[in-house]
Amino acid sequence: MKRTILLTALLLCAAGTRAQDLYNVKEPPTTEILSRPVEAGRIHRTEVVPYDKRHDADARNLAGVEAYMAYTPEPFAASGDAVAVGQVVDIPYVWTDGVVYLHLENVGTAYTLTVNDSKVAEVEDSSTPAEFALTPYIRQGKNAVVLTLRRSAADEINAAPASRKAFENSYLYTQNKRSIRDFEIALVPDSTRRFGVLKLAIVAQNAFNYDEPVTVGYDIYSPQGKLLEFNMQEIVIPGRMTDTVRFTPFIYGTNANKWEPGAKNPPLYKVMLFTRRDGAYREYMPMKIGFGKTELIDGRLTRFDKELKLVKADYNAAADRKTTLADLKSLKAKGNNTICPDYPQPAWFYDLCDELGLYVIDCANINAPEKRDDRRIGGTPSNAPSLADEYLERVKAMYYRSRNHSCVIAFSLGGESGNGYNMYKAYEWLKSVEKSRPVIYADADGEWNSDL
């Protein structure tokens, strides 16, 4: 079976008295409910945790970060094929003055997310990590964050989920109401091919109900540890809105630090994004990027004006980072330079591929090999218009999580799942947001919705 409900059900005996805690969390008076922020429910954006202090961001050290808490739900009820798991989360006062998010990973099945008995979202994708904006649903003090694990309404397109510890790397975190909502970043050659250009777009958000100034900035260090550029900009954003701040500085010396497969230690530039308020830095978001640009030119996949020769290996991340690192090193030693997973991977998988100099063709969790040749309407899930929104949701979830990684050179619509209306719509959406890298679909079978 493509889900882990039975495994979760076995954990019921360990639930203890937590069930009583979950059932006893009452709704607060309406006057206590926080004002609605920029967004609510499921969101799509770059997967990155904000840090309180720069040294913690540099070290990726979450211990002691006040804006972060682990989410480790326990089973407390079962009914038919569904199992309820949850955690009573104690939200401190300082969090209620910000925007609160939940990151879910390794759930292993479809689920319905509720917070304090309010439905937040229903998710059919059993493998792709997901994020949710929770601010309208939470309050100071105890909050019941519950997942109802169930059979997916789109089970026929789910890949078998990875065998990892349930809910590993799931967490809640908060950001200031004036903060970084998302970003796009790339370090690419300039038009003369002599220098590099940092193309950075920071989406800033203001979750207050009125206009507020928001200051965002960045710095970038060379692979050798030299500070190359530092800048910040203030922008006034209307209440409950976002706006984009763009930076495009020249970065010199990049041709000596090209990110390419084959190198023993591919060079990576360190970028730190931050916000500033009243002279103090409020949050830090770290990122490592390689210099170069993957482009589709005249039907050829190129980098540094040379056609790429891809040696592919099908591989999904193992249960842990250490094992995955060993596997990836072994694949590289055998001459492979391109990794092709079956569905979106943990964020650390892309970090490893960045560090090792391995290309990745990222893939949405769409895997429906049965009846893939039946092109009647509804004959295959890929040609069932009722699933169009689900296909788009999965493609968006894949794209926004991994698009900023240097290792990702192309995006695949899914595994062998036939072709049809849903794949056409998915291709059109991806092409509307991705202007450089190709969109690939092996089962396009010569139709227009695949670039290679």
Regions found by a protein language model. Give the residues of each.
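N-terminal signal peptide c-region/cleavage motif recognized by signal peptidases
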Residues: 14-16
